[in-house]
């Protein structure tokens, strides 16, 4: 029966007989409950949609409020000697986050006089989360909630539900994406991710120590470098203290612009800040925080010695970590002592910020090497770099003198939205693209994120759409959304945009034709964010996978009988039996034996 192996035939059978969109979610082992009665008669179905059940389970295992699967279609490809049939489906999953009042904006009578304090407090809460030491939840056992009876609750899922409400979770939400990342990492990745975070923290403490350093600092607090040029361990030991609110509160007298530069320089590691703005250290250029640079060692400029021995020192540092390396590298060649002219040495000494830049480049190179050691599953940093976009937006606002209640509110709201978008897209990427068994067989065709801001009565304030096609759609979406939201922060409180401002905004967000209505973008830019009570996030994506055909003659015979009986009932305008109806197996229709499906073995005759 050729119809069994064609897209049109499978579509007809799926619609009227098997209902594959539901049947594929059942246990289809021979004799299982789902196979009893019509139309399977204790046997698996004649087709199997590879990956469909896993796709649905992936969506069910996440904190989506609603899930829909539409446009289940079958397409056929016929080439000389081969025939394939694929299934495709559009998945739409969504959930709503409560964008209620953030505690920094609650009960503030004189907002203008406390604006700087609020801005620095908001920055401090965020940077503490971005540089906090990562520690995955550990332990075994079950969790029981008083209002959920005897049903066990996963702690991770419970926390994600908690993070949906900004009015309830407040600053606890900051760093949610990174915390979930390390929660899903293996033992080796945990060590590497914690080391990377420790290096960023140490570098931030190092550069912040300079601008916070007061005259008359005790000599004992200084750490002399280059420590035989193997200074990384001493660097981490000296600056490994976690960044906390107490540390940052001591910077109240420091210009916010300078603090933001330090944050961007640390958080953007191992990449260079896009505007290449490095914080400028106090006093001489040969001084870095509480590190004191010796002018020379054995007649050589110290930064030059550090630079020449950088690779060797980094390799030794990684080798000492309690992890097995993915591949052993060739040790760098020994440093060749070359004579350096006195003039060259003098030039080396007076390069502005040479010491600080060498420290950052060393830390950046080490972080890059550690990221290469991560497993493929943990290496997807593209979902966790969005914080840099928002710190840079704050830096631009500070430079423009445009820090006000509206820009701060939007900064917090969009940061909150980005945490959720990053967490969800990373989850989908891990399950649908990074899981090799699924990704080898099922293809991601396109992905879309829809953001609907709603007021307290549920009305839509504005709606944004981002689309991407191809296998890398999830990561490309994250990059676009992060850049888009960060660029729109500067428009808060400016009302409707002028013609030239519209062109500038479209350029800043890298607008694409498939990014929704331009009027919605302009409405988003001009809206007063105090009107927004909640934000609905919808994640839509289309996947395509193969359909496999049974080669068991018994299943083929049952299918022939079922299809013939169903066709007869349809021709007579009679209803078809309900699934699992207890009716006898219809007789085998008369006529010649159907040809074998592609690849099937002929039946043995005795």
From Swiss-Prot:
Preterminal protein is used to replicate viral genome, upon genomic encapsidation it is processed first into iTP and finally into TP by adenovirus protease. GO terms for molecular function: double-stranded DNA binding; single-stranded DNA binding. The keyword Transmembrane does not apply. It is found in: Host nucleus matrix. The record marks 515 as: Priming of strand displacement replication by covalently linking the first nucleotide of the new DNA chain. Keywords: Covalent protein-DNA linkage, DNA replication, DNA-binding, Host nucleus, Phosphoprotein, Viral DNA replication. Belongs to the adenoviridae terminal protein family. This is Preterminal protein.
């Amino acid at each position: 029966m050729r119809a069994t192996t064609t897209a049109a035939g499978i579509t007809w059978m799926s619609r009227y007989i098997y209902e594959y969109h539901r049947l594929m979610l059942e246990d289809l082992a021979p004799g299982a409950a789902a196979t009893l009665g019509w139309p399977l008669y204790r046997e698996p179905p004649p087709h199997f949609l590879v990956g469909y059940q896993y796709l649905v389970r992936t969506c069910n295992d996440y904190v989506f409020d609603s899930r829909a699967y539409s446009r289940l279609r079958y397409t056929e490809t016929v080439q000389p000697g081969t025939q394939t049939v694929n299934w495709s489906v559009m998945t739409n999953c969504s959930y709503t986050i409560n964008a209620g009042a953030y505690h920094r904006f609650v009960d503030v009578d004189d907002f203008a006089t406390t604006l700087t304090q609020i801005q620095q407090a908001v920055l401090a809460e965020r940077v503490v989360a971005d540089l906090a030491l990562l520690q995955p939840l550990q332990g075994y056992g079950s969790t029981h909630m008083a209002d959920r009876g005897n049903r066990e609750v996963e702690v991770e899922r419970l926390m994600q539900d908690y993070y949906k409400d900004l009015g309830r979770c407040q600053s606890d939400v900051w760093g949610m994406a990174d915390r979930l990342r390390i929660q899903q990492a293996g033992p080796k990745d945990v060590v590497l991710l914690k080391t990377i975070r420790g290096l960023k923290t140490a570098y931030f403490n190092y550069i912040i120590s300079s601008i916070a350093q007061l005259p008359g600092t005790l000599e004992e607090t200084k750490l002399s470098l280059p420590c035989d040029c193997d200074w990384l361990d001493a660097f981490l030991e000296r600056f490994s203290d976690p960044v906390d609110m107490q540390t940052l509160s001591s910077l109240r007298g420091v210009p916010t612009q300078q603090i933001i530069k330090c944050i961007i320089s640390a958080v953007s590691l191992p990449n260079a800040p896009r505007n290449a703005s490095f914080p400028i250290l106090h006093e001489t250029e040969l001084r870095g925080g509480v590190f004191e640079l010796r002018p020379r060692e054995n007649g050589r400029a110290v930064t030059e010695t550090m630079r020449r021995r950088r690779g060797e020192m980094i390799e030794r540092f990684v080798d000492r970590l309690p992890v097995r390396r993915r591949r052993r590298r060739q040790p760098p060649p020994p440093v060749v002592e070359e004579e350096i002219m006195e003039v060259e040495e003098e030039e080396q000494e007076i390069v502005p910020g040479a010491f600080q830049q060498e420290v950052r480049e060393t830390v950046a190179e080490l972080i890059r090497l550690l990221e290469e050691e991560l497993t493929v599953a943990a290496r997807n940093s593209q979902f966790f770099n969005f914080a840099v976009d928002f710190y840079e937006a704050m830096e631009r606002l500070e430079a423009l003198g445009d820090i006000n209640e509206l820009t701060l509110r939007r900064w917090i709201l969009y940061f909150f939205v980005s945490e959720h978008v990053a967490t969800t897209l990373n989850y989908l990427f891990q399950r649908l693209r990074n899981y090799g068994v699924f990704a080898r067989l099922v293809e991601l065709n396109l992905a879309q994120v829809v953001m609907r801001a709603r007021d307290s009565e549920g009305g839509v304030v504005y709606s944004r759409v981002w689309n991407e096609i191809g296998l890398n759609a999830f990561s490309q979406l994250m990059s676009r959304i992060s850049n888009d939201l960060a660029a729109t922060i500067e428009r808060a409180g400016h009302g409707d945009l002028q013609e030239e401002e519209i062109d500038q905004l479209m350029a800043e967000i890298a607008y694409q034709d498939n990014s929704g209505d331009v009027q919605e973008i302009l409405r988003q830019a001009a809206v007063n964010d105090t009107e927004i009570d909640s934000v609905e996030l919808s994640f839509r994506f289309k996947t395509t996978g193969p359909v496999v055909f049974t080669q068991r003659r018994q299943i083929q015979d049952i299918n022939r009988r079922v299809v013939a009986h169903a066709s007869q009932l349809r021709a007579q305008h009679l209803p078809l039996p309900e699934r699992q109806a207890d009716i006898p197996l219809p007789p085998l229709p008369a006529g010649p034996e159907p040809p074998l499906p592609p690849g099937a073995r002929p039946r043995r005759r005795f």
